[in-house]
Amino acid sequence: MGPFWISTPPTIPSSDGTPSSVFTPSEWVKEISVSMLRRFDLHTHSFFSKDACNSPEELIAAAVRRGLDGIAITDHDSCEAHDYLRGRELPPGFLVVPGVEVSTAEGHLLCIGATLPMMKGRPAREVLQAIKDAGGVAIPAHPFDKWRAGIRPNFLDTLDIEVLEVFNAAVTSRRYNDQALEYARRRGLKSTGASDAHHDSAVGVSTTVFEMEELTVPALLEALRKGGRPEGRYLTFREGLKKHFGNWFRIFNRRPDRNPK
């Protein structure tokens, strides 16, 4: 028997923070080739976000060390990282996915597979349409997390979305991930897991595994719409401290170097 592909979101236990190695009923599972499995972290932040400090290259290097096939750099209301990387040499066999985390009027919305003009503060429906027009996929980030500008369920109900982030490694309470997973199941949405890394040590803590024949942005977007398997764990207490407090000193000292000559 070969490896398995979970075509329906797995149950993610909140007791130990590990959503991987989850068994599902046999009717949810099919056998596939290992060569088609690709692992992505679709929610990361570089020093082009005000609350993060690592360069795009450092995020990429961390992802490569951890065996990922690609990342989406989704800075807050900024696509500068992708302009920054244009023309720079990237690791072979690794995909950097365009993206941005937009602070809409109703909460945070990820754009995956495309870049956008500045849309901070615009209505979520308007941003959602802009993402679709740009050819990307819209994913509400850390929904239900009221302390981190997650879009609340009563408004989520009105959004024409296909995918939901059901496991965010940095949520302020694990119940928010449980609620997101239940909501995705109820609406029949596809699921993702991501680190929401604001420093390179958190990259790849949580990821999504996809079935893909090609390592390209169009293939990833197609796989997103078909559905992936969230994997990984929550940030440790130490990692959480680094995210919320330790970064500020590093940001103060690193941000002037973000455009090295």
Each language-model region and where it sits:
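Charged catalytic cores and adjacent phosphate/nucleic-acid-binding surfaces used
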Residues: 23-52, 56-61, 80-86, 91-98, ...
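Divalent metal-dependent hydrolysis catalytic cores, especially in the metallo-beta-lactamase
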Residues: 59-80, 137-139
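Aromatic-lined carbohydrate-recognition surfaces of secreted/lumenal glycan-active proteins
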Residues: 139-147
